[in-house]
């Protein structure tokens, strides 16, 4: 063997010996995050997870969609019983009471402080934080994907009736709908009356008018809360909606009927809808070419002192029973999500709103709201912060609330099909909903909400 080859062989042997002598790089600690978003939103979550994993080398989050919110909660309960629960899980607003009573979580504040992170909990918008907070104001989970309902209106159609602003009151909205009908528009406003629309129609209306949905401050003060929405201004509201429907001023739109509300508005078929700010991007991408439209806060009845609207969406819970290393990873992940730059990424790609004041200010300073397609989404923040949350407008803390929402849909269908009167339908909602609450109270007998 030549001297040159001997040198190469010796060098290679030396490198090999050095490599064997060095300790192997530690593999990152893996932990699971389960969530309920699908489609485009699932892809955005997966990108966010990828961004976190690439931002550091110590932890790797494995993000798995469970398909929808209900499945996520049910799968998490089953996994917890089998000792296979994820470290972090996304739980929708209606599941908050169940999570609080489960005791199966690691409180958000405790997690972050014990892992060396300083979070300004007062930075969260009150209208968002208090929906997920305990009765004493402590956040047990991290608000995540958040939205509220807005009025979408067709500026071109309103120009035909001499209007340049959206209606601020329901009295004005009624007059505008009649004028639009008179101007030849077949569908001045579209609504959906399914169970999912309880959030837009019953919950938002009640909050804006400071009207209770249930006793015990909407359930925050005890599991013995019972529905009383059949005794509030909500009855008048449904009466008016039904009257406007009978007059042809409102059309019911849904996927089951061939065209959902958002499609009906974006196509120019209907001139007003009430839906989530999360649909803002969808309208922008699918609107009829050249259509001028905007968003506004939902109307209230004349003489009403407007209160904050309610947040919708979900929060992130850290579950008990995981290792210290997994908790370190979970804390790092939640701190990453809390960063204003992540808020900008999230809102840009989803339509959800920032949950903290610092995130909102960062987005404003970045020019996010200055022009299309994002201009107008700041109205959602104005709606959520229209007032300091009251004992009623901080949120709804009722057990098995998804079942109550479904019952809302059943009774609204009966009302609009003339099977029952408005009062009878809402009385039935209260009666059947209270049976749900009684069963939930019995299940957690002896327990108290934190």
Each language-model region and where it sits:
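Glycine-centered hinge/linker elements that transmit conformational signals in sensory
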Residues: 176-179, 220-254, 298
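Short, well-ordered beta-strand elements
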Residues: 27-38, 59-64, 88, 140, ...
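Long, aromatic- and glycine/proline-rich binding clefts that accommodate carbohydrate-like moieties
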Residues: 293-300, 348-410, 414, 442-450
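Extracytoplasmic/periplasmic solute-binding protein
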Residues: 135-144, 149, 174-226, 242, ...
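Hinge/lid segment of periplasmic solute-binding proteins
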Residues: 94-148, 200-207, 294-296, 371-372, ...
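Extracytoplasmic/periplasmic substrate-recognition and gating elements
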Residues: 27, 82, 137-138, 159-161, ...
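Short, solvent-exposed loop/beta-turn-alpha elements that line the ligand-binding surface or hinge
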Residues: 109-124, 211-236, 285-288, 299-308, ...
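Extracytoplasmic "Venus flytrap"/periplasmic binding protein-like
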Residues: 51-124, 131, 156-168, 263-264, ...
